[in-house]
Amino acid sequence: MVDVHSQAIRSKNMRAIRNQDTAIEQRIALILKDRGFSYRVQDKALPGRPDFVLPQERAIIFVHGCFWHRHHCYLFKMPATRTEFWNGKINSNVERDRRYIGQLQQSGWKVLIVWECALRGKLRLEDEALIERLEEWLLAAMHSGEIDHQGLHHYRVE
């Protein structure tokens, strides 16, 4: 399938996609604030520059886009053009995620990934369900987890 945009226009569009303070990150920030959790954002001192750091809970939350981090859900679809480029790009993102999560866990942090599909789209979690899953993870002995449109799951660094 041929892209409807020229390579220059497509490149411009992709550069315009924000990588911090996105709408889905703002939703998590509002939930954390409403529940009284203190947190820092985009902490450069930690591997992976986590989206949210909750120091009192020794917990980290990453908010991942399903496309950019290859979540196998209904929101992910590999582009039909420049497939080799996108496959390499997304593979490197996934490998980097695993490396950072492993480093954080070795340093004693609990790590949670909240996937975009949990926050937006036709199957997103309702606010109350999302809040319950976040609190469940924070209170559980689960050292790494992920929340997607289906709920809370264990996450394993391979």
Spell out what each predicted region is:
Residues M1-I113, R120-E158:
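Nucleic-acid endo/exonuclease domains
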